UniProtKB/Swiss-Prot annotation:
Keyword annotations: Ribonucleoprotein, Ribosomal protein, RNA-binding, rRNA-binding
Cellular-component GO terms for this entry: cytoplasm; ribonucleoprotein complex; ribosome
Protein family according to the UniProt entry: Belongs to the bacterial ribosomal protein bL21 family.
Protein name stated in the entry: Large ribosomal subunit protein bL21
A GO MF term: rRNA binding
Gene name of this polypeptide: rplU
Domain of life: Bacteria
Keyword match Amino-acid biosynthesis: no
Pfam families with a match to the protein in the record: Ribosomal_L21p
UniProt key word Ribosomal protein: yes
Alphabetical list of InterPro entries matching this protein: bL21-like, bL21-like_sf, Ribosomal_bL21, Ribosomal_bL21_CS
Length: 136
């Protein structure tokens, strides 16, 4: 399994190809491709590359799926015995980013197409009339 740890919006995030993540707002519109160079760690089948502070030659490519707003956070301030109360709400602007590929030194380690091929199909159990029993 290949994954990387990136830094975006002042936060560190573990990402894998073929998954989407909600991160702080990025400039760009829906469908734009984004390249992230702030890669702190890359792991590929037991081979770990740790940056000091960044991994040289590592690149994460993704596509902006949509812009959205996070859950509302209520900020409530109160001074006891003074009848002073303030209630404010805040919703963080977010970007949903689909990770397309993880590459190191020009070699693609994981991509969206590879992750779709590698996932096994879910087994569906078939129910036939012979296996059902009626209770009287």
């Amino acid at each position: 399994m290949t994954y990387a740890i990136i830094e975006t919006g002042g936060k560190q995030l573990r990402v894998e190809a073929g998954r989407f993540y909600d991160i702080d707002l990025l400039s760009g519109s829906e469908g734009d491709r984004i390249s992230i160079n702030n890669v702190l760690l890359v792991q590929n089948d037991g081979d770990v590359h740790i940056g000091q502070p960044l991994v040289e030659g590592a690149l994460i490519e993704g596509t902006i799926m949509k812009h959205l707003r996070g859950k509302k956070i209520i900020v409530y301030k109160m001074r006891p015995k003074k009848k002073t109360r303030k209630k404010r709400g805040h919703r963080q602007e977010l970007t949903r980013l689909m990770i397309d590929s993880i590459s190191l030194n020009g070699k693609v380690l994981a991509s969206l197409e590879k992750s779709l091929v590698e996932k096994p199909e879910s087994s569906v159990m078939e129910v036939t009339s012979e296996t059902t029993e009626t209770v009287t």
